[in-house]
Amino acid sequence: MLTRKQQELLLFIHGTNEGNPGVPPSFDEMKDALDLASKSGIHRLITALEERGFIRRLPNRARALEVIKLPEAYAGASQVRRGFSPTVIEGSLGKLASPPPAPKPAPPAEAASVAVPVMGRIAAGVPISAIQNNMHDISVPVEMIGSGEHYALEIKGDSMIEAGILDGDTVIIRNGSTASPGDIVVALIDDEEATLKRFRRKGASIALEAANPAYETRIFGPDRVKIQGRLVGLIRRYH
């Protein structure tokens, strides 16, 4: 499973080559297409795509990449229409142009993991300003997340301790705008503050319920709260 940015870059490279065979996108074009601030982000995405087997560096051809496969959702349709063959992209890749390393054996299925972007910190306490920048990626077991788009957030605060969520934990969130009563959700309040709380309904209003008796349940009108996803997993590091 690819992150959204990895998938966007892979499809952009493949689409550019199809539309202009032999004319690769430059790093500036890739950076602008993905709305990234610097080229270093493109380097990291290309490396991640290579590690996941979607592209490879070509030996004996300076500054060349080969698109080996597309994500299943795109590859199937592509093969039906015209048959998919690897796409070769040549360009100025700097250090990325070195010959590819020897293939590594695939890990056993139970050890498979995916990269999930850590988007910032979220309050399990008093709401803090929402952070929407990709800080880094975290490796998450495939069986933890299942289908859908996911992101991760680092917990700040102790309002969810009775739900087993502690300060410093990393929570895995399935992106979505709906929730069922009892779900633990990322709630955006007044488009300004984000908090992790249990979702409840109180008549026509929305209640954000803590899992710590030191914190009061907060009630909002439905137009003030937007659901940004629901909790599906948690990662804790012991120091």
Curated annotation (Swiss-Prot):
Represses a number of genes involved in the response to DNA damage (SOS response), including recA and lexA. In the presence of single-stranded DNA, RecA interacts with LexA causing an autocatalytic cleavage which disrupts the DNA-binding part of LexA, leading to derepression of the SOS regulon and eventually DNA repair. This is LexA repressor. GO terms for molecular function: DNA binding; serine-type endopeptidase activity. It comes from Rhizobium radiobacter. Belongs to the peptidase S24 family. It catalyses: Hydrolysis of Ala-|-Gly bond in repressor LexA. Homodimer. GO terms for biological process: DNA repair; DNA replication; negative regulation of DNA-templated transcription; proteolysis; SOS response. The keyword DNA repair applies. It holds the Pfam family Peptidase_S24. Keywords: Autocatalytic cleavage, DNA damage, DNA repair, DNA replication, DNA-binding, Hydrolase, Repressor, SOS response, Transcription, Transcription regulation. SUPFAM superfamilies: LexA/Signal peptidase, Winged helix' DNA-binding domain. Residues 27-47 bind DNA. Its EC number is 3.4.21.88. CDD domains: S24_LexA-like. The record marks A124, G125 as: Cleavage. The active site is at S159, K197.
